[in-house]
Amino acid sequence: SELRVDKIHNEGGDNDSGIDLSTNDQIVLKTAATTRLTMNATGQTTIVGEGGSTTTSVQQGLAKMWVNYTGITTTAARDSLNLSSLTDSAAGQTLLNINNDMNNDDYSGYYYTNAHANTSYGNFDNVYAGGFGSFTTGQCGNNAYGSSGNVDSYNNFCGIFGDLA
């Protein structure tokens, strides 16, 4: 069976909250007569921010790939999203192979490493660092540096943001 309507609203309350289906090819969610969420025919979704005056694109704010991995003994992901594999390319250097490619190589991201072979999070002085080494649409590289050079690290956390292809 099928239900065909233009609007669903709160009949028992103040009558200014509900779902508006009357606009062309989009769904509009309103509360207190104000649009709070819009989803268009392509799935692009915008939502009103905390202050109520700005909107945020949900897709733009989501991580497109993230991974928690170890580089000790055998480089392996503990958990991930949109990651097809990891490649141990050298001591302290790992290539992250993205399952669904990015739209271009200008995306942004974060990378944390403890730059140590144990589970410690205490290596925060200036001789320990981690960063991105390369960006392509299907891959990014991480590099972990310890006090004596590149080092395979136990704790590595990486995420990237941007548009998928």
Predicted segments, located by residue:
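Extracellular attachment/recognition segments
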Residues: 63-165
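Intrinsic low-complexity, repeat-rich intrinsically disordered segments enriched
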Residues: 1-78
